[in-house]
């Protein structure tokens, strides 16, 4: 099979010269391909994934450990107190409740488990509860324990690390140049600072964003290169699910092929990093969900999301086992 010449040249460059071979302008050229070349992009992204990531699949799971009443005004989020939604407001779950859910998801086949909380940050007592839960989960399951708790201080990051948290998740959400259109209650640099604090404490970094917010293709590349500069350890890719009551409620879903092209683009820019397909997968990709691996993905969230329902974990495991893996 003869691939599109641009796709083939850039893919070979990545295979020959290493994970950071692609320049910003070369990445942008992949967003300007004719429609007939998009399948070639997927095949090349799959080849890059297999070269750097083999066929290992990461199955992430998350728990909404504290829900609603967030002071931030992120345009897409149903948990923001600036939006009128039907999200249930709930304080932090007990450590026991978090441990129980982790054990259930471990039995179901998840490989990572993340405790996720609404709000800008947790207080010291809440951090202690999460740390206690993480310690028990680490000892009683096979799961890699993750946390997504908003902004961090050095002391809170150190407590999480001591408790057994391995990965800290904190999305940039979008490009720096587009961020003011999405959130005005905190600065982009605060998110980057949290990632740096987490890394200094010895936590691995999981950071990505949401696509379909109105950002341009160049801004998608911009965020990818910011993540590359930060050298994050894994990258979650979300697609906007326009929820009633949010400022994004009337936005259209990304077309499935465009969503898959985003995945392939990020595989070219991040050849050796796990790309995890997360929120909006089912509603955006529909019958094309199994194509995520062809497009370069190496993992996904299984089970439910924060405020929306996912599909049965068994269905996703069957999809993987009967597909490319």
From Swiss-Prot:
MF annotations from Gene Ontology: 2 iron, 2 sulfur cluster binding; 4 iron, 4 sulfur cluster binding; biotin synthase activity; iron ion binding
Binding site for [2Fe-2S] cluster: 114, 146, 206
Domain Radical SAM core, residue spans: 52-281
EC number(s) stated in the UniProt entry for this protein: 2.8.1.6
Pfam families: BATS, Radical_SAM
Co-factor requirement: [4Fe-4S] cluster; [2Fe-2S] cluster
Cofactor binding note: Binds 1 [4Fe-4S] cluster. The cluster is coordinated with 3 cysteines and an exchangeable S-adenosyl-L-methionine.
EC class of the enzyme, as a word: transferase
Pathway: Cofactor biosynthesis; biotin biosynthesis; biotin from 7,8-diaminononanoate: step 2/2
Coiled coil residues, start to end: none
Catalytic activity reported: (4R,5S)-dethiobiotin + (sulfur carrier)-SH + 2 reduced [2Fe-2S]-[ferredoxin] + 2 S-adenosyl-L-methionine = (sulfur carrier)-H + biotin + 2 5'-deoxyadenosine + 2 L-methionine + 2 oxidized [2Fe-2S]-[ferredoxin]
PROSITE patterns per record: RADICAL_SAM
Cross-referenced SMART domains: BATS, Elp3
Keywords annotated in UniProt: 2Fe-2S, 4Fe-4S, Biotin biosynthesis, Iron, Iron-sulfur, Metal-binding, S-adenosyl-L-methionine, Transferase
GO biological process, one term: biotin biosynthetic process
Function as written in the Swiss-Prot or TrEMBL entry: Catalyzes the conversion of dethiobiotin (DTB) to biotin by the insertion of a sulfur atom into dethiobiotin via a radical-based mechanism.
The family this protein is said to belong to: Belongs to the radical SAM superfamily. Biotin synthase family.
Subunit structure: Homodimer.
Protein name, as recorded: Biotin synthase
Source organism: Syntrophus aciditrophicus (strain SB)
Gene: bioB
């Amino acid at each position: 099979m003869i691939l599109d010449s641009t796709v083939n040249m850039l893919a070979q460059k990545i295979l020959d010269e290493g994970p950071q071979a692609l320049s910003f302008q070369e990445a942008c050229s992949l967003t300007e391909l004719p429609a007939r070349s998009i399948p070639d992009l997927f095949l090349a992204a799959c080849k890059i994934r297999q070269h750097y990531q083999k066929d290992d699949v990461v199955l992430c799971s998350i728990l909404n450990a504290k829900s609603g009443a967030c002071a931030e005004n992120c345009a897409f989020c149903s948990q923001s107190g600036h939006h009128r939604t039907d999200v249930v407001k709930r304080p932090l779950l007990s450590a026991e409740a978090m441990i129980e859910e982790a054990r259930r998801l471990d039995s179901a086949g998840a490989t990572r488990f993340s405790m996720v909380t609404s709000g800008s940050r947790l207080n010291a007592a809440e951090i202690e509860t999460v740390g206690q839960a993480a310690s028990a989960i680490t000892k009683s399951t096979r799961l890699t324990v993750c946390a997504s708790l908003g902004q961090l201080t050095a002391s809170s990051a150190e407590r999480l690390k001591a408790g057994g948290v391995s990965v800290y998740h904190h999305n940039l959400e979008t490009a720096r140049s587009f961020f003011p259109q999405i959130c005005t209650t905190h600065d982009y640099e605060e998110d980057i600072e949290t990632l740096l604090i987490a890394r200094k404490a010895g936590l691995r970094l999981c950071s990505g964003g949401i696509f379909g917010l109105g950002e341009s293709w160049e801004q998608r590349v911009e965020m990818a290169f910011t993540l590359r500069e930060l050298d994050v350890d894994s990258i979650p890719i979300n697609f906007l699910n326009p929820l009633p009551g949010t400022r994004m409620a009337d936005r259209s879903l990304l077309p499935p092929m465009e969503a898959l092209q985003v995945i392939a683009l990020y595989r070219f820019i991040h050849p050796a990093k796990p790309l995890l397909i997360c929120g909006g997968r089912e509603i955006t990709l529909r019958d094309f969900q199994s194509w995520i691996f062809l497009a370069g993905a190496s993992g996904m969230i299984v089970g439910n999301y924060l405020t929306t329902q996912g599909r049965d974990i068994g269905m996703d495991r069957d999809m993987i086992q009967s597909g490319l893996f």
